Amino acid sequence: MADPLDLFAIDKIIETAECSIEPVIASEASIVKKIDEYYKVADTVDSITLTSDEDEEFDWTEELHKEEAGEEHIQHVIRAILKQAIIEDVHEVNFEQVEEGLKVVFKKNGEPSDKGTIPAILNSAFVSKLKTLSNLDATVCEIPQLGKLCFKVENAMLIASVSSFPTIMGERISLKIYKPPKHLDKIIPDEKQRSIISHALNNPGIILVCGSPLSGKTHMIYSLLMEAATSGKNIMTIESIAKYELKGVNQCELNENVGFSMDKALRYVEFQSPEMIYLEGVKTRDAFEFLSELFYNDKTVITEFMANNMTDLRQKLAFEDFQSFKTLITCLIFIHSKDSVEVFDKETLQKYLA
């Protein structure tokens, strides 16, 4: 009650409840704190444990029937889906609107796999909770949004980008899981290849990381940035969303909602005098021309390019728009799979792409 000294109100409560009452004075902050402590559902997926022997046969749909529908139950369903994705080494999970509800689709090596459906009665609550956990506006469904979901697997903190996109059936949600970066010697054991990368990181030029979708390009790039951060250089990134915070790297997230687009970032980033820049997902001719300008200004540039294999890469770079760009690549890292990575120096690459 607002006034614990209101004797008339206290007497009325005693009479109605037939209980004795002992008034206690407390601050509003302490009351709110206790309410949150005992009643609030945490805005987190909680930790995912992978130590059980039955993990290989784990099925997230069993979580649907374990308890009554509610906010906490929805969080358990989200956690179960993420757990199954981790067990199956899946890095992309899509939630698609269908008549029966929300279809859960795992995508691995480019192949989609139907993993069941969230009943239509839970659609709204599930999408709303997933968006809230990802720092998206759950009340907005007419425009695309991009957010970030953090969750723990054993002792490692994982990040997933969460993208919502409006369709005529309702919002489609795409979730991509990114694993923490590793030191280069853990993912590229060959000393000669690491030497090529080290030389490229310490000299002006363009380091191009290639591979098929979800091949691990971002994981590799973050490992490169982590390696370069020890040099003390002014390193900057321009990304749609920062997957992990890297010590010694000035990471920048684009925000279209306030007009901070890639074009605007490219116009102003040089005022920060970066020595190394990572540009995510360069696709336009203007962006490629900007990469060339950075090279001529003695910058080291890291970017990525999608290609399914080396033949595909040669065909894509054969277009006239890429002729100048190709000559500036000082190091190419091609990711065939998580266990197969090729590294090319400038001389070898120019012969191959000629």
Task: Label every model-predicted segment.
Residues 1-30, 38, 53-210, 215, ...:
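N-terminal "pre-motor" subdomain/linker immediately upstream of P-loop NTPase catalytic cores
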Residues 14-18, 40, 192, 224-226, ...:
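Short, solvent-exposed amphipathic alpha-helical segments in soluble enzyme
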